[in-house]
C-alpha cells in the first residue's frame, strides 16, 4: 500500500483574481485528494523569500517575489496516496507552453510567470514549505472521505 503524503499547494494571485480557486480545488478533490488545511492570505516578503529560497540566485527571483506578494493567495495542504506526484500531474508542467491540455496550467495559463498555482516538487519540499507557510504548530483537520474505500485498493 502506498504511503499517504501531504502536499503543499498555493493558488497564486493570478489564479485568485481570475476566479480559479474553486476550479483548482474541484480538480484536487475530484481526483480523491483531501484538503486538510486551507487559508486565504497575503504573503509577506519574508515568507515568500523562504518559500522560493532555491531560486534566490536566479534572474527572475525578484519578479517572482514581487508577484506572489502582490495579491491574495490561497494556501492549502492536501493529503492522499502519492499526493505529491498526483498534484503535480493535475497542475501540469511549470511552463504552461509545455503543460498538457486538461491540466490546470495547460487549461488556464499562458505565461510561466503567471502560471496559476504552485505545488511542492517532492515530499521533502512539501514538508519544508508547509512549515514555512503554516508554521511548526500546524493544526490540520483529520477526516475520512465517504468515498475513500472506493478510491484505493487495501
Swiss-Prot record:
Biological process terms in GO annotation: CTP biosynthetic process; GTP biosynthetic process; UTP biosynthetic process
HAMAP family to which the protein is assigned, alphabetical: NDP_kinase (MF_00451)
Active-site feature positions: 118 (pros-phosphohistidine intermediate)
UniProt-listed SMART domains: NDK
Keywords: ATP-binding, Cytoplasm, Kinase, Magnesium, Metal-binding, Nucleotide metabolism, Nucleotide-binding, Phosphoprotein, Transferase
Protein's recorded name: Nucleoside diphosphate kinase
Recorded family membership: Belongs to the NDK family.
Annotated residues for binding of ATP: 12, 60, 88, 94, 105, 115
EC code(s) of this entry: 2.7.4.6
Enzyme class: transferase
Needed cofactors: Mg(2+)
PROSITE patterns assigned to the protein according to its UniProt record, in alphabetical order: NDPK, NDPK_LIKE
Reactions it catalyzes: a 2'-deoxyribonucleoside 5'-diphosphate + ATP = a 2'-deoxyribonucleoside 5'-triphosphate + ADP; a ribonucleoside 5'-diphosphate + ATP = a ribonucleoside 5'-triphosphate + ADP
UniProt KW Transport keyword: no
GO cellular-component term (any): cytoplasm
